[in-house]
């Protein structure tokens, strides 16, 4: 029903489709008369919330949450990729500590 309202609205706005008194479409006929009451009765109907639309809105909400999570994950992955690496690896630090015979101090931190 909604698609019919959209098609009729677009056709009337473009002047391509004009509904005549006999309810047959006339293409490129701008002189034909059409009933305004018929158009208003079609376009003024309020869409009602149905059981079909509620699950679809929750699915859209779930999809939005997944996309937000994925975007945050990509940002974190980019930060980890561009993070400056430490000048010294942990094993290298321990090796230097053993080789220096306790003259150097190796600080191990996270």
Swiss-Prot record:
Lineage: superkingdom: Eukaryota
Signal peptide annotation: 1-22
Key words, A-Z: Glycoprotein, Host cytoplasm, Host nucleus, Secreted, Signal, Virulence
Locations listed in the record: Secreted; Host nucleus; Host cytoplasm
A cellular component annotation (GO) from this entry: host cell nucleus
Role summary: Secreted effector that completely suppresses the host cell death induced by cell death-inducing proteins.
Name this polypeptide is given: Secreted RxLR effector protein 89
Organism of derivation: Plasmopara viticola
């Amino acid at each position: 029903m909604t698609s019919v309202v959209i098609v009729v609205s677009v056709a009337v706005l473009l002047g391509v489709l004009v509904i005549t008194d006999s309810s047959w479409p006339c293409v490129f006929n701008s002189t034909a008369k059409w009933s305004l009451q018929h158009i208003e009765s079609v376009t003024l109907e309020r869409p009602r919330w149905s059981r079909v639309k509620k699950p679809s809105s929750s699915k859209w909400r779930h999809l939005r949450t997944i996309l937000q999570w994925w975007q945050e994950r990509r940002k974190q992955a980019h930060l980890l990729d561009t993070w400056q690496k430490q000048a010294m690896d942990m094993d290298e630090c321990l090796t230097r500590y053993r080789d220096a015979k306790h003259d150097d101090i190796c600080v191990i931190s996270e």
